[in-house]
Amino acid sequence: MDNKIKTIFLCIVFLVIGIGAGYGFEYEFSYQQTKHLIKNIVPVRENNFNYHYIYPLLRYDFGNAKYFLEDKNLEEKINAYIQQQYQAQNAESISVYFSNLSAGTWSGVNADTSYIPGSIMKVLIMMAYYRESQLDSSIMAKNLVYTDQVNQAVSKIPYVNPVNLTVGQSYSTKYLLEDMIENSDDAADTLLLLNVNQSILDDVFGDLKVTVPGTTSNYTISPKDYTSFLRILYNATYITEVDSEEALSILSKSTYHDGIYAGVPSGVEVAQKYGESLDVDPQTKEVTATYLHNCGIVYAKAYPYTLCIMTKAKGLTDHKQQAAIIKDISAMVYKYVNSGSGK
């Protein structure tokens, strides 16, 4: 009997030791894993060496920790819709990136796929001028003349938007920025580009870790990368708080009311930019693909969020089907957000 008791006692002791050791190992593994994740959360700072005492912060890169913030439920809904559109041959490629600006949760479907951006890059030109205004406050009032030479250059741009400028007339930089963003006026864009401080514009691209378009052919960007510009404006971490507020106010006055804007209820503010572009065969001059993108911040009642949708269709299209796809995804995301999900 005594031997049996001893045996039972020893078994219990070894069991307790085993459980303790297992718990200790699990704790140590969990601790090391958590430590690794935390170490991978790193600040992304301005690529600016003009300062001696400061190193301005733009945002944080969450590394592998970001996967704990991934909203897979929304992702699955978006992906199911995209697959339906592929089956119906309504688009060749669709990419979406969503980010909750309050809680940091995100969803992405083909979010790292890159596209020819078109006019959505006008936002960076605006940021460059606001950046320059911090050095020279008179820049916004400076008048620029819309010449016939500029008008000739504008007429050669594919998908050129209605030009609101008159040859021979002068316009303030501030007016041109508003026209470029609100109406996506390519004339205003061209005139601003010809007069921008190129060094500051290059710095903007460098600071935001984006390749300068002129340094590469077939320039492309992904929805995920583009969203970082919107987040930086929202957080006011690159240009001043006053300028960031003003820039987003201009974006909220966009006259483009298809896409994301059409997918949310009337009265919901959307600070957004859209862009169109084409792929053209260099030999035959035939249009092989049409691009339509729409990216912005939706100020939903539940919480503000970024949504960037990029689309590519085969051949030359009128954008209607692509705009409908963007609208549908926007409506889906808005409904999901305001149902209390994704917090």
Where are these regions (language model features)?
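Short glycine/serine- and small hydrophobic-enriched flexible loop segments
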Residues: M127-L135, E182, S228-N235, A331-K335
